[in-house]
A protein has these predicted regions:
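Polybasic/polar functional segments that serve as interface/processing modules
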Residues: 1-115
Length: 115
């Protein structure tokens, strides 16, 4: 899991992204499509067409980092807007990375009774 400070801004790039893109291609998409600066320290999250893989672009002040996660089962929950970006919290990103619906997180663990 990526350690994300609670005050960090996280942007979801809505729609579908060519997940084959690397740092340069995603940085260009942030600038041209989202109209934001990829070098300010915000996290930018992109989802592939199938929905089972995301990439996160982040500039930490020293350089760009690119993180990727693919789910073994299921798909990442994503906003239905076709273009633009949606801001979410660091906690919502943590839910997303765990494969949980970040819009309505539900605790699913139920302890079993002993005996």
């Amino acid at each position: 899991m990526i350690p994300v400070p609670s005050g960090m801004r996280v942007w979801l790039a809505t729609g579908k992204t060519d997940i084959r893109r690397g740092m340069n291609g995603l940085s260009l998409q942030v600038q041209e499509t989202l109209g934001r600066d990829p070098f300010v320290g915000d996290l930018f999250v992109f989802r592939g067409k199938r929905g089972d893989m995301i990439k996160i672009l982040w500039h930490d002040g020293l350089g760009l980092s690119l993180y990727a996660k693919r789910l073994e089962r299921g798909r990442f929950v994503w906003p239905s807007a076709e273009s633009g970006s949606v801001a979410i919290s660091a906690a919502q990103l943590a839910y997303m990375l765990d494969g949980i619906d970040w819009r309505n997180p539900v605790h699913t663990f139920r302890p079993e009774r002993a005996g």
